[in-house]
């Protein structure tokens, strides 16, 4: 049962804290902290002492709970701790393949080479990891060492779909991943949204020469996330911040943190007031500024400042334009569809149900420029 604050002892607080991390006991939480701290500090001696004293740690998740970072050797592979990896392998660690996959998706190529020399080999579907993290160097390494460009079921479109739909944001890595896919024989559509995905201003210049209305054109979800490249029919599985369906190229640039392309679009006359299309149920009509507020680049730690919002506001973006939006987040505790009717960019951020997605720096700047709820 529940313990009142007046009755609680230190041991009760310790147990509650351990369980909040998904661990059964305070001593197990302490061990997890000691192990992960030692790996981060590259303290092979402490890691060795812990494993000798508690041999089961060699095969349990380093954090003590279920985690894709894995047991200590795999955990070390994520951050390139080669000395610790070699020691743990000698001590009997068996998670060689998982460690190899983690090194590749984190771009730790020296570590991946070490694990390859130990006998790890690219498994079918292993390229999906670097595609998820947009790690072009890890992707190229796997392909150079014989990896199949497919998921575990052999679907050759799955990797490129992952690059386009992943939660990760890393413009340069994404551009290079798509070029690697093209080198693997994937035919990327010659569309303007794909030119943005690829970071190709040269291709956008060609599109603009052929289509004077390009900069104000609204693009459907399917044009942004092509089904023929394996992109999902469930739009919510394309992991963006503010909805992109029906948006302009400027909307797309904001969500993928394509600052250089956005600047080029504005120089070419893109309208910061351009609104996304409104769907049959009345949702849409938002400008690119909304995407600076509920932001996937902010969510993943890439864009913590207000510079994208500043770019748009400096070009005259209206801080009090209104729109109605709806959003379903995925792979979170609450996956329900939420609706936000008649909100400003500031109101969109103020009311959004997951504040981890809301760029507070952008909100402050919008408020300074006269934005209100």
Predicted regions and their residues:
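Short coil/turn connectors between adjacent alpha-helices in alpha-solenoid helical repeat scaffolds
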Residues: 40, 165-173, 296-308, 354-359
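Ankyrin-repeat boundary/"N-cap" motif
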Residues: 31-37, 60-75, 94-105, 121-133, ...
């Amino acid at each position: 049962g529940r313990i009142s604050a007046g009755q609680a002892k230190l041991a009760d607080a310790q147990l509650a804290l351990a369980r909040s991390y998904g661990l059964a006991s305070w001593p197990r939480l302490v061990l997890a902290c000691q192990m992960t701290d030692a790996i981060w500090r590259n303290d092979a001696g402490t890691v060795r002492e812990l494993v000798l004293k508690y041999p089961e740690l060699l095969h349990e998740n380093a954090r003590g709970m279920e985690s894709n970072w894995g047991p200590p050797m795999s955990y070390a592979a994520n951050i390139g701790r080669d000395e610790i990896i070699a020691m743990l392998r000698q001590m009997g660690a068996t998670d060689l393949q998982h460690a190899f996959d983690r090194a590749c998706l984190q771009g730790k190529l020296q570590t991946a080479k070490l694990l390859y020399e130990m006998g790890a080999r690219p498994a079918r579907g292993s390229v999906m990891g670097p595609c998820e993290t947009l790690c072009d160097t890890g992707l190229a390494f796997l392909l150079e060492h014989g990896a199949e460009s497919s998921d575990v079921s052999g679907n050759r479109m799955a990797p490129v779909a992952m690059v386009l739909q992943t939660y990760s944001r890393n413009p340069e890595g994404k551009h290079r991943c798509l070029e690697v896919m093209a080198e693997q024989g994937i035919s990327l559509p010659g569309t303007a949204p794909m030119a943005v995905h690829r970071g190709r201003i040269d291709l956008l210049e060609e599109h603009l020469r052929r289509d004077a209305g390009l900069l104000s054109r609204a693009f459907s979800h399917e044009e942004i996330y092509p089904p023929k490249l394996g992109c999902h029919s469930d739009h919510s599985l394309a992991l963006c911040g503010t909805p992109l369906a029906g948006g302009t190229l400027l909307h797309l640039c904001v969500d993928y943190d394509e600052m250089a392309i956005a600047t080029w679009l504005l120089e070419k006359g893109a309208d910061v007031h351009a609104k996304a299309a409104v769907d049959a149920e009345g949702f849409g009509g938002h400008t690119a500024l909304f995407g600076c507020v509920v932001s996937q680049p902010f969510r993943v730690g890439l864009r913590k400042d207000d510079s994208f919002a500043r770019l748009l506001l400096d070009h005259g973006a209206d801080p009090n334009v209104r729109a109605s939006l709806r959003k379903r987040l995925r792979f979170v505790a609450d996956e329900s569809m939420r609706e936000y009717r008649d909100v400003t960019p500031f109101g969109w951020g103020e009311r959004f149900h997951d504040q981890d997605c809301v760029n507070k720096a952008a909100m402050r700047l919008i408020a300074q420029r006269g934005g209100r709820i």
